[in-house]
């Protein structure tokens, strides 16, 4: 199977966790896009969705799936999204698509976070994929200097503005042995909106596309 076929397989496999009558948290990216395709087959059975990006919102609406503001819901039964990297503790790096802050908010609201990935995303230690950090524009240089102190090599992601009007620094050269500690440290830097480490709130279920089929990890 190609990588895209693996992504499609896990996107459709996630439908098993969607309960009729609920509002579904929906992520962003190529794998989440396959999940939206699958979710469209249940559009008459679910109340709607909360989306982590303008791109996902547009796709959901194109299928006629109602999209709610996160402030309109008290809780979400499920949140389905991909990851750029995931370790064996189900902690992740996310934010390659620059939607990390909204993704983190929806993950916090959701009772169950189902992460859908192909097997190339699994790693023993996080950090090979550059770690995205969403930053208030005026703090960009200061935050970059602070990230260097943590051993990182931050790079400004040019021509990218997040849906929240902020900028992204991608941090290279990190071997993340303690993801929770690093998440807390980076989040405490003035001017950081959030870091793309999902360690304090990791995944509850991982659906991993492999050459042998979809593997479920809980």
Swiss-Prot record:
Task: Name the active site residues.
Answer: 103
Q: What is the lineage of its organism?
A: Bacteria, Pseudomonadati, Pseudomonadota, Gammaproteobacteria, Enterobacterales
Q: What is its EC number?
A: 5.3.1.6
The cross-references to PANTHER family, in alphabetical order and at most eight, read: RIBOSE-5-PHOSPHATE ISOMERASE
What pathway does the annotation place this protein in?
Answer: Carbohydrate degradation; pentose phosphate pathway; D-ribose 5-phosphate from D-ribulose 5-phosphate (non-oxidative stage): step 1/1
Q: Can you say what this protein is called? A: Ribose-5-phosphate isomerase A
Its GO biological process annotations read: D-ribose metabolic process; pentose-phosphate shunt, non-oxidative branch
List the molecular function annotations (GO) for this entry.
ribose-5-phosphate isomerase activity
Enzyme group, top EC level?
isomerase
Pfam families for the chain: Rib_5-P_isom_A (PF06026)
> Which protein family is it in?
Belongs to the ribose 5-phosphate isomerase family.
Q: Where does substrate bind?
A: 28-31, 81-84, 94-97, 121
Keyword annotations of the record: Isomerase
- Quaternary data: Homodimer.
Has the keyword Glycosyltransferase been applied to this entry? no
- What is catalyzed by this enzyme? aldehydo-D-ribose 5-phosphate = D-ribulose 5-phosphate
Q: What does this protein do?
A: Catalyzes the reversible conversion of ribose-5-phosphate to ribulose 5-phosphate.
Q: Name one GO cellular component term.
A: cytosol
